[in-house]
Structures are given as C-alpha cells and as structure tokens.
C-alpha cells in the first residue's frame, strides 16, 4: 500500500510497503517500514510506536494518507472494496436463509440500512436464480450492530412463469432489524420504451472527489454540494454524485447489490443543503439522522465497476422527516435505477448523543 504521513506541515514518511492491521473495536493501524520514516523531523514525545522494523503513527496527531488510484484518502479508513463485496456476498444457510459476515466501523458500529437492502437483493437473486430483482422495498425499524453477522430469512410469496415475489426479514440475535418485499422478473422484449434524461452535470473527471473511507470506491460530487461545513453557502436540495466500485467480481447480483448499498448515503445531505447553519458533520453529533425506508426500482443490468450518476432531490423536509426522489444513470445517460428514501432528521434527546447503544 502506498501511504504517507505528515506532521507539522512536513512529510515525515512516504512508503509503498505500508501494512494495514485491523483491530477489534479499535481504529486500524498503518505500519510504515522504519527505513521510510524521517525520524529527524519528529519530536520524541510519543507520536510513533515502533515494532519489528515498522512504525505506527498516532493518527490523531499525525495526518496519515493512503493513495487510492488517483485519489488520496485519510487514514484510518473503514476498509477497501473487497471488504464491502464480502459483506454483500451473503452465504446460504439452509433452504431460504442467508447469513452475512460482519465488519464494524469502530467510531459508530451501526449497519447502514442501504447495506441491508443490497444484501437482501443478493440473497433474493440467488434464491430465485435466473431472475433479476426489478423492485425492492425495505424498512428499517431497528438499528443493527455492525459487530455481529446478519440473518436474512426469505419467504417466497409467489413464483410464476415470469415473476417471483419474495419477502425478506433481517434478524440479529433474534430481533428484526429490517423487513421488505422484493419482486424478481425473467424480463421480456420491449413493447414500449422511454426513460427520463439524466441531469446536466459535469462528468466524473471534473467533479470534486469525496473521501468516504472505502478504498476502491470512487466518489465525485458535482458543484461542491457535499460538505460538513455549517457555514457553506446554501443551495437547492439537490445532490449529484458519480460513483464507481473498482475491481469487482463478475457476479451481476453483487453489482446490483452495490448500487443499492449506496442509495442511503447522500439523500439526507441533499435535504440539509438549503438550510443555513446545518452541516453534514452534525449527523450523529447534534442531529439524530437515520434512513427509515428505501424503495428501489432496477431498470437494467448494472455494471457497478463503471461510473454511475446518482441524482438526489429532496422534495420534502418537515416534521422531523425528509423524502428524496432519486435516479441512477450510467455514464452514457441510460437510466439504471430509480429510488426514494424516507429519513429522519431530529435533534438528539438530552444525553442521547453520547449514548453508545445502537438504537434509532
């Protein structure tokens, strides 16, 4: 891994042989070979830990960066694209049950609702082999703990010549965390066809890169619309983002699952954009935010390893809730998917911001 470290404005380490070490319930650590560290530029007051020819920096005091394709991302990161694929790649555990692996963010070990939606799409696609998920709706009544695996129980409501309907219930330690319905289709030749045009936004090469702590996932946001700064200029409740997942296996249901996995990331940011004095960084600090439900229609086969344009428009915010109507286009402009997101944006009850329990 190519990485570098900065302290007091000076480059103190630059290496192509840095090694990541994941720790349980703690931030991962990046170890630099000692030969790649400029010890003469560092104070002797505990900025580093040495072990077996390697050096680890205190990430709170030293800025550590990793190179990810053409982007530079701040370390520690959540993981890379292979970790995300492993989460989506649910395993069969009986006739109509699938289970996931787990991977936690040490800062807030809560499973994203859109991750569970993506996993349910993968599970249903494998259950009804040869049919493609065309519609999926899921609600998230209870937060799931990212430190524990998830269980997906499927109920085949009907299976005809063309369509299969599957109910999905996501459980953890016997408690229901999400429930939904998925429709799968063998698909058919066109009788009619039309689709809405994509928004007029710059291409991914000229949009601003955004670091969301996953290497191998490229994100570009148009018009500087994603910011944690509460003093940033206000804008319309619209957010356009190009997304690409690199180095994926060929499995089509994983590509569809990854498209779904990102549907919960930016709709709340779009809702906050018109409101002065409220930045995205307030989420989970002074604002209680969460995705409550997602409805997704998949209009075509998905190639998540190519650029996809996610267009988010928040059409309503009030009574502690937001509603967003969104579309996904490929780089050529074809409509891949449409989705809506229901989310909450509320002040934290007294003391709740410091409550480490995973509850909505």
Predicted regions and their residues:
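Terminal leader/tail segments of proteins
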Residues: 1-80
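Terminal targeting signals and extreme-terminal segments of soluble enzymes
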Residues: 73-360
């Amino acid at each position: 891994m190519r990485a570098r470290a900065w302290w007091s404005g000076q480059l103190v380490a630059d290496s192509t042989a840095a090694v990541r070490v994941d720790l349980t319930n703690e931030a991962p650590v990046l170890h630099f070979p000692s030969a790649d560290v400029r010890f003469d530029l560092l104070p002797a007051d505990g900025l580093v830990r040495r072990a077996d020819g390697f050096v680890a920096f205190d990430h709170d005091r030293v800025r550590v960066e990793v190179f990810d394709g053409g982007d530079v991302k701040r370390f520690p990161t959540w993981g890379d694209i292979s970790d995300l694929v492993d989460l989506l790649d649910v395993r069969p555990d009986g006739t109509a049950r699938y289970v996931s692996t787990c991977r936690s963010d040490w800062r807030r070990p809560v499973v994203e609702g859109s991750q569970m939606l993506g996993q349910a799409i993968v599970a249903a696609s494998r259950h009804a082999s040869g049919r493609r998920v065309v519609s999926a709706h899921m609600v998230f009544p209870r937060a799931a703990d990212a430190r524990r695996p998830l269980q997906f129980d499927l109920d085949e409501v009907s299976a005809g010549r063309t369509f299969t309907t599957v109910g999905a219930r996501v459980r953890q330690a016997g408690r229901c965390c999400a429930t939904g319905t998925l429709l799968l289709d063998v698909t058919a030749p066109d009788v009619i066809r039309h689709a809405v045009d994509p928004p007029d936004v710059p291409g991914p090469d000229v949009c601003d890169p955004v670091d969301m702590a996953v290497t191998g996932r490229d994100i570009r946001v148009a018009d500087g619309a994603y910011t944690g700064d509460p003093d940033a200029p206000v804008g319309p409740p619209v957010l356009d983002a190009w997304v690409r997942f690199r180095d994926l296996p060929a499995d089509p249901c994983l590509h569809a699952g990854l498209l779904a996995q990102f549907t919960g990331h930016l709709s709340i940011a779009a809702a906050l954009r018109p409101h002065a004095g409220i930045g995205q960084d307030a989420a989970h600090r002074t604002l209680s935010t969460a995705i409550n439900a997602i409805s997704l229609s998949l209009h075509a086969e998905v190639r998540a390893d190519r650029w996809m344009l996610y267009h988010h428009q928040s059409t309503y915010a009030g009574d502690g809730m937001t509603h967003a109507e969104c579309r996904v286009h490929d780089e050529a402009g074809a409509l891949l998917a449409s989705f809506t997101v229901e989310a909450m944006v509320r002040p934290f009850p007294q003391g709740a911001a410091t409550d480490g329990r995973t509850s909505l």
